[in-house]
Regions:
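Positively charged n-region of N-terminal signal peptides that target proteins for export
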Residues: 1-5
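Bacterial N-terminal signal peptides
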Residues: 9-21
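Divalent-metal-activated hydrolytic enzyme cores
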Residues: 25-64, 87-88, 97-116, 129-225
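Short glycine-enriched loops at secondary-structure junctions
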Residues: 71-76, 96-99, 125-128
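Catalytic core of membrane glycerolipid acyltransferases/transacylases, capturing the structured
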Residues: 76-93
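Conserved functional hotspot residues or short segments at active or partner-binding sites
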Residues: 122
Length: 225
């Protein structure tokens, strides 16, 4: 029995990474936690995330998410499922095309500044309808509100076309999806001063990724946030 106890403690010491963020101990590196959760999802070994009565009661008293996720509204890409996380783990802001407006930016600021999530991720996804619609956008094709949203994606489309002559439309869409996620992260950084402030203090990491339906995996811009 003692040997088993010691062995368990050794495993815990080897696997638990600790860091201090605003005086709070985070058991696992947040980026690693997302990657491992996505790996479980892609391998069809997602954990059971149903909540017990005790867990629901605990959540009713407050939340301590470890990441703020900006994602698309597309019904096929729920971050909680893709990253195999439970209620209270992720603070999520979703708009079509993983774009951001004033209210989304305010929500992101709340996530990183008040909920103190140590990780901010912008996640796009393959076959994004909003990015596809932003190609060859014509005046009057969509309602004013939809047109305004798609115009936020147009810079990524233009970048993809200008930087990749000779690529097929399908390839350009894939490239624009990745660029759009990167552009959105830059916009967030430019318009939410807390992002740079927290990054400079070492209290916030950022990253972008694109979810692929065929593999179930999120392809990250970099291995380190």
């Amino acid at each position: 029995m003692r040997a088993r106890f010691v062995f368990s403690n050794v495993l815990i010491c080897l696997t638990v990474l600790t860091s201090v963020f605003f005086g709070t101990v985070i058991a696992v590196d947040p980026m690693q936690q997302l990657q491992e959760g996505n790996r479980r999802f892609a391998n069809n070994t997602s954990a059971n995330t149903s909540l017990s009565q005790k867990e629901r009661e605990k959540l009713a008293t407050g939340q301590t998410p470890f990441a703020t996720i900006v994602a698309c509204s597309d019904s096929r890409v729920p971050p909680e499922i893709i990253f195999d996380q439970g209620a209270g783990d992720l603070f999520i802001v979703r708009l079509a095309g993983n774009t951001v407006d004033e209210f989304a930016l305010a929500s992101i600021e709340y996530g990183i500044s008040y909920l103190r999530t140590p990780l901010l991720v912008v996640m796009g996804h393959a076959n994004c309808g909003a990015v596809k619609a932003a190609f060859n956008l014509k005046e009057g094709e969509f309602s004013p509100k939809l047109t305004a949203l798609l115009k936020n994606i147009e810079p990524a489309v233009k970048q993809a076309i200008d930087q990749n002559p000779g690529k097929s439309q399908e390839e350009l869409v894939d490239i624009a999806i990745k660029l759009n996620a990167q552009n959105v992260l830059k916009e967030i950084t430019d318009r939410v001063p807390a992002v740079k402030e927290l990054k400079d203090k070492g209290k916030l990491s950022v990253n972008t990724g694109v979810f692929q339906f065929e593999t179930g995996k999120v392809e990250w811009q970099s291995d380190e946030a």
